[in-house]
Amino acid sequence: MKLFNTLTRQKEEFKPLVPGQVSMYVCGPTVYNYIHIGNARSAIAFDTIRRYFEYKGYKVNYVSNFTDVDDKMINEAGAEGTTVPELAERYIQAFLEDTRALNIEEATLHPRATHEIPAIIDFIQTLIDKGYAYEADGDVYYRAKKFADYGHLSDQNIDQLEEGASQHVNDEEQGRKEDPIDFALWKGQKAADEIAWDSPWGKGRPGWHIECSVMSTKYLGDTLDIHGGGQDLEFPHHENEIAQSEAKTGKKFVNYWLHNGFVTVGKDEEKMSKSLHNFVTVYDILKNVDPQVLRFFMASVQYRSQINYSEENLEQAANILGRFKNTLEGINYRLADATEGLPDPDLAKLVTETTAKFEAAMDDDFNVQNALTAIYEALPAVNSNANAEKADKESLRLFAKKLAAWLSVFGLDVDKLLAKEAGDDDAVIEELVAQRTEARKNKDWAKSDELRDQLKEMGVVLKDTPQGTRWSRE
């Protein structure tokens, strides 16, 4: 299996620290609002990656944090007239509800920054003791230039970074920082009513970057197999995590850095973000869109690529999902009949070849498009066999099992996909289908067509097969 490592800008063979196990940390949300689909994209991308590791037999220790104290949270809590903890609790629960709806597996652990304050203080003190950090008027800053590899992950040199930093430092910070490029590890309390904790440097709260260094190393060890997040976190967040963690431990922090692409909107494909006010929340989308369709839409694009959110692209995803559903229904319908099966060597070979193609694609940095193409190209032959006079039932049964496993990697629940919503008119539909079957048996084509038209007006789609007529709702 090969992964594209952002640190080296190339694909590398995946070699876990512990054979058969994967340690994986993914930056979670800052919980001051409902998540939008840009946030969901990251959660779905890394859930798909996790699921494929599990498909391959790995045990995955998946840690994803909640940033539950932050400038944005303080501002939002003030605007709403509530407290930061109350705001955090509300949106953590909303996040969990949204991710459950999208069939995102629960993390092994969801640490919260505010629950790790003692560990954060100890981590910062170690950096001070080693000369990598310094206190200034109640704040603590990291000496970025002291870390020799600073800028490596984002492929920037110190001069470039310093020039950019000097343009964003306010006068107050300038007076405290030794260098514009230095970043905050601890922020002193600015107002008496601002959320804060006691520390050796006075009351205050942690900086964003130190939170993830502490939580990832505390729960996964000094060196991680994989660290993931959005491409917008590459710098400064992940760059700073490396500087902090490796300065403290003296060890390589992460072996494989994975970054997912953005969700864009509109004809200009503008990045979706809260700051640009062009976002749509998962909560609002799911009022009108099937969760499985949204999940499949997000999971069906390779994680490093951008996704353009549009009604047309959602509809296309729904159509592809419908093809998979029809194939599974056709197989199940055929397996349920009493006809004797007939082995088909070509179909058996196709199942084996499709499995190999699917896994080869996913082993190539999780190339989901090629994996889906392999499945999609197998459907005509599978459908043809399912409708044949004598089907290869064993191969069909195996393909259905494989397809369920493949779709599960994409986060789809086959049982839910195949579940029919019971309607008050089901019995009426069954009776009309039976009457049409009898009319066809008697070659009363006019009556058959009349019944088909009547069923169509009821929103019922018919499919005639050698084994009988199947129906579904539009």
Curated annotation (Swiss-Prot):
Named cofactor requirement(s): Zn(2+)
Binding annotation for Zn(2+): 27, 212, 237, 241
Gene3D superfamilies according to UniProt: Cysteine-tRNA ligase, C-terminal anti-codon recognition domain, HUPs
Co-factor note (free text): Binds 1 zinc ion per subunit.
Subunit structure: Monomer.
Family, similarity comment: Belongs to the class-I aminoacyl-tRNA synthetase family.
Identification of the protein by name: Cysteine--tRNA ligase
Gene: cysS
